[in-house]
Every structure is written in structure tokens, then in C-alpha cells.
Amino acid sequence: MKALRLSASALFCLLLINGLGAAPPGRPEAQPPPLSSEHKEPVAGDAVPGPKDGSAPEVRGARNSEPQDEGELFQGVDPRALAAVLLQALDRPASPPAPSGSQQGPEEEAAEALLTETVRSQTHSLPAPESPEPAAPPRPQTPENGPEASDPSEELEALASLLQELRDFSPSSAKRQQETAAAETETRTHTLTRVNLESPGPERVWRASWGEFQARVPERAPLPPPAPSQFQARMPDSGPLPETHKFGEGVSSPKTHLGEALAPLSKAYQGVAAPFPKARRPESALLGGSEAGERLLQQGLAQVEAGRRQAEATRQAAAQEERLADLASDLLLQYLLQGGARQRGLGGRGLQEAAEERESAREEEEAEQERRGGEERVGEEDEEAAEAEAEAEEAERARQNALLFAEEEDGEAGAEDKRSQEETPGHRRKEAEGTEEGGEEEDDEEMDPQTIDSLIELSTKLHLPADDVVSIIEEVEEKRKRKKNAPPEPVPPPRAAPAPTHVRSPQPPPPAPAPARDELPDWNEVLPPWDREEDEVYPPGPYHPFPNYIRPRTLQPPSALRRRHYHHALPPSRHYPGREAQARRAQEEAEAEERRLQEQEELENYIEHVLLRRP
């Protein structure tokens, strides 16, 4: 038996080396022979051939058993059918030797018949979708028949099937399967890309491959992993096969190599079937990608529109600011020109009269309001008050104009600019000095260069010619000289109080109140006052907004105190002020006039010291 085992091991190594070296890289065209009982009977009936003679047909059958299309390896084969074929290859009986196996012939024939019937039942039950797992045939496990079961012919058959599996899962075959799967996946990808680009809708935006489009679209929930096949569940990688116990403990190489061959078989089956669910994307996934692409496109357009609106708002703000600056400069120039002309027209006396008129109008308005005591004003008084207020505003505007002009001159006086002297300001000033009467010795001198430079810079900033600036300064100087040469103005006497438009006759004293009548009972206190006369009508006055006004009962005093309402005359001190009040008012007016003249003089001195400085 040891010699048989050694010869079987050597034969296994020789067949393995020859099979791996002589395996053709191409695709064989022969189909695997059908496994049936008729195919096994001649092998069982023949005599035991030599090791080389018996291995030749098995090797050729193993070489011809490669499938035609390696790209579709086990694509249409049921895992249960594949497991049954492998079990049949493992359980194939061997023919007993002629001289020494005569005493065990009936037992082997009975086992072979039982195995043949089991395999046929499995083959017929393969098309059924839910067939129970075939039961393993009962095999005796006595230590006596263990060594005898390991026959060389049985080992040869197991080695031939193992060699076929090794050839199927060689590195070159696995590489060809990967290339075929990649080519098929790429074909399906390009097909999906072409259909996606040619279909109407927002998919036209992505002119790229499906991979780039899928990279742009946010990832969705991953697909569930494929469920493990029945073959993988039934045939684990690490667990030994229950049908391999018939080889005995001595022959361990078929079990080891078969376990190693089944592991890449299940992995290859999963690897071949895995790319197709990934490449065949359902219509819902395409629709989801298109919706996500549309959302991305809308977000991009919204961002571009927001940036455009922001740029437009910035441009409009800059244009508005520039327009306001131009308008402000124009208004300043117009204000200076109009204010100076109005000030020249009014003069010092005109300003004083305007202030006096304003004060008188204000006093008249206050007196009229006090006389009327809340009554409506007359339209003429409103017009006079409006005119007085307008004149007061004009006078105040002229004063502010002079102050503003002085501030501008003060701001520009300190700037030193190295510019060439212009002849126009000096010539104009000489002519003005020639036309003036007399004049002091200072008027004959020319203006210093610093003053001329400040005038030029001021005219440039105010958008005014230098001649206009010089003329304004000359007018201020002439006014100052007239004020010095003019006699002092007398203080105006205090004006008499205006005569009242109407005088109220003194009212007679109110009559004595009538004796109190019998009051109504307390429970009738909430009712109207029945003791009032029916024809009693109250005239409109401060206590009655309109005639026959009835005040609420809850806010009235007792009936004894609310008989009649009399309008008492106002105290005479409010309408006819005394001499003390008139003197006090005249003193206030004189002080106000003095303050105004002092401010005007300070303004003129300020302008003189800033713009008319002499060397």
C-alpha cells in the first residue's frame, strides 16, 4: 500500500506540472463530457491500466472541460449544480484491481450503484428552484476499508478534476476575466454617457464622461452589498468537506488543494458578477443625478446673479456719491453768490431793520395769541407772520454766509503754494483802489504774494474766478470803512405797545346763587340732571367746545356749584403792560442789537486779518 501511495503522489506531481505547463492560453472549443452512469461503467469494468495509460484520457478530458467563454465564467450556472458536479467528481468510485479485489467486488458494486442513483436524483432535481439539499450517501467508516478506499484510479480522477479547476483559475485566466469585465463595464459606461448627453433636460450641461458627471453629483446612499451565494454559504473556505472522509487520513493532498480551489472559485464568481449592478444604474439613479445637477446649476446661477447685483449697487452708490458732491459744490457757490448780493443790498441798516421787524412781528404774534386765548387766528396775521419769518430767515442766511466765507478763507490762508503771481488780481485791485475816495496809505500798497496764492487756491476750490474773490474782499473792506466813518447811530426809543383791537367791557358781578333745591335721592344720582332748564344753551367758550355741550355726570361738581358758567375778563396786566415792563423790553432789545453789532464787527476784523494782511 505504501508503494501505491508513493506512486499516486508522484503521478499527482507529474500531472500537475504537465497540466500547468501545457495549458493553452486560448479558449478551447470542446465541451466537458456529460457525467452519467454510462460513462462510468466502462471505466469500472476494464482492467486496471498502468498509471500513464489511465492518466491520458483523464488529462484530455480535463483539458477539454474548460468553458468556451471565459468572460462569462459560471454566469448561467446554478451554484447548487456546480456543487453537485464537484461532489460527483470527488465521490467517483475507482475500479478494483483484478487479482486482489475479487473478495470486495460485491460491496464496491453496491456502493457504486447507490452512488449512481444518488447522482441521478440530484441531476434531475437541479432545475427546481427550491430543492432540498441532497443527503450524503451513507459510507462505512471502518478502519478496515479506509486504506482500501484510497485506490490509485480514484486518486487519478480527483487529481484530474483538481487540475481542471487549477487551469480555470490560473493567473492568466484571472487576468483575462478582469480585462473582459473591465471592457464590458466601460462599454456600458459609454452607453450610459451617450444616452445621458443626448437626452433633453439639464443633463446637456455636463459634456463629459459619466465618471466626471458622477464626481460632480453628490454621493447618494451606497448600494447594498450582494448577498452571498448559496454555493458560498454551503461551501465555506476554511471548513473541510464532509465527503472527503473516504480518502482516509493518509491522503490529505486532494482535500487541501480542493479547499484552496473552492476559495478563488467563490471569489471569482462574486468578482465577475459585481461590476454589472454597479454599471447598470437604474433610471431612478439617473433622475436623482439630473436633479442634483440642476440644483448645482441653479446655485451657480444664483451666485453669479448676486455678484452682479452687488457690483451694480456699488456702481450706483459711487455715481450717487459723485452726483451729490457736484450738487453740494454748486449749491455752495450759489449760496455764496446770493448771500453776498442780499447782504450788499440790505447793508448794516437793512439787517438791523430786519431784526427789529422780526422782533416786532414776534411780539405782535404773542400778544395776539394772548388776546384770543385759543381762538382761531386771522388769515392776515398768518401772512404777516410768514413774511416776517421769511425776512428773518434771509437775514440769518446772510449772516451764516459771511461766517462760512470767513471759515473758508481761514482754512485756505495757511496753505503756502509756490505759484507764479497772476497780474489780474493785482491789476484789478489797483483799479479798485484808484476809484476809491482818498484812502489811506495802506491802500496804495500791493497785496503780498502769500495773500495772492491763498486767493488763487480759494478760487480754485470754490470754482470761482480770482476777480470775483477779490471783488468780494473789496466790498467787505468798503463796508468796514463806511462803518468807521459813519456817525454812531442813536439808540432807538422803545416802541409803544400796540393798541388792542377790541376792548371788552367789564362784566357785571355774578348774581347770588339760588338756594339749593331738594336733591334727588341717591339711587337716582346716575340719571341726567333734571333740574337743568330745558331752553338752557351754553355758548361756545373755553369750557364748551361747541354749543349745548353736556359734560359727563361723573366729572361734574355738585349741582349747587354748576348752575351757570361766566366768562370773566382777563387781567389787564397781560394786555396793558406797565412802564416797568416796557423799559425792561427796550433794554433787552438794545442789548440784542449791541450783541449783533459786536458780532458783525468781529467778523469783519476776522476777514481783514486773514485776507488783507500787509507785509
UniProtKB/Swiss-Prot annotation:
GO terms for cellular component: cytoplasmic vesicle; endoplasmic reticulum lumen; extracellular space; Golgi apparatus; intracellular membrane-bounded organelle; transport vesicle. Residues 415-433, 577-599 have a biased composition (Basic and acidic residues). Residues 22-201, 218-257, 342-600 are annotated as: Disordered. The modification Phosphoserine is found at residue 420. GO terms for molecular function: growth factor activity; hormone activity; neuropeptide hormone activity. GO terms for biological process: carbohydrate homeostasis; defense response to bacterium; generation of precursor metabolites and energy; glucose homeostasis; insulin secretion; ovarian follicle development; regulation of synaptic plasticity; response to cAMP. Residues 1-22 form the signal peptide. Central and peripheral nervous systems, synthesized exclusively in neuronal and neuroendocrine cells. Multiple peptides are derived from VGF, with activities in synaptic plasticity, antidepression, penile erection, autonomic activation, and increases in energy expenditure. Residues 179-194 have a biased composition (Low complexity). Keywords: Amidation, Antibiotic, Antimicrobial, Cleavage on pair of basic residues, Cytoplasmic vesicle, Growth factor, Phosphoprotein, Pyrrolidone carboxylic acid, Secreted, Signal. The modification Proline amide is found at residue 577. The keyword Transmembrane helix does not apply. The modification Pyrrolidone carboxylic acid is found at residue 310. Residues 25-35, 129-141, 487-497 have a biased composition (Pro residues). The keyword Phosphoprotein applies. InterPro entries: VGF. Residues 378-394, 434-448 have a biased composition (Acidic residues). The modification Phosphothreonine is found at residue 424. PANTHER family: NEUROSECRETORY PROTEIN VGF. This is Neurosecretory protein VGF.
